Swiss-Prot record:
It is a single-pass membrane protein. GO terms for biological process: protein transport by the Tat complex. This is Sec-independent protein translocase protein TatB. The chain crosses the membrane at residues 1-21. Part of the twin-arginine translocation (Tat) system that transports large folded proteins containing a characteristic twin-arginine motif in their signal peptide across membranes. Together with TatC, TatB is part of a receptor directly interacting with Tat signal peptides. TatB may form an oligomeric binding site that transiently accommodates folded Tat precursor proteins before their translocation. It comes from Xylella fastidiosa (strain 9a5c). Gene3D superfamilies: 1.20.5.3310. Residues 119-140 are annotated as: Disordered.
Length: 140
């Protein structure tokens, strides 16, 4: 606290002995010791309080940093959830659009390995009747 060496302390004691005398010196020394002790305890008290405040500030900063990290993580999760919802909606709309464009593909889908049978349809033979008599032949 004070940068006082032994030689300076001895000089102060000699001056105090000369000024106060041998009768009042012990009482003054006790009083000076009491003042020094009070000053040290006050200094230690202030120092401890300051350290507690600094620790409290550090804890508050750490808590705020942790809350910010949590907030950022929640925002990222919400963004990812919205992206997933959008992707699901797009997928559903894609499937609905495919069904609307090609409705027969969904109902008549063929599995691999099934045979496909082709049926040939021919038109009926042309009729020999004349068109003017409504399908009846002329008799002569």
């Amino acid at each position: 606290m004070f940068d006082i060496g032994f030689s300076e302390l001895l000089l102060i004691a000699v001056v105090a002995l000369v000024v106060l005398g041998p009768e009042r010196l012990p009482k003054a020394a006790r009083f000076a010791g009491l003042l020094v002790r009070r000053a040290r305890t006050q200094w230690e008290s202030i120092k401890q309080e300051l350290e507690r405040e600094l620790e409290a500030e550090a804890l508050k900063r750490n808590l705020e940093n942790a809350q910010q990290v949590i907030h950022d993580a929640q925002a990222q999760l919400q963004s990812n959830q919205q992206d997933m919802n959008i992707q699901n909606s797009i997928s559903i709309l894609h499937e609905q659009t495919k069904r609307d464009i090609h409705p027969d593909r969904n109902t008549n889908t063929l599995e691999l390995g099934t045979a496909v049978h082709h049926v040939h349809v021919t038109s009926p033979p042309p009729s020999t009747s004349t068109h003017g008599n409504n399908g009846q032949e002329k008799s002569q």
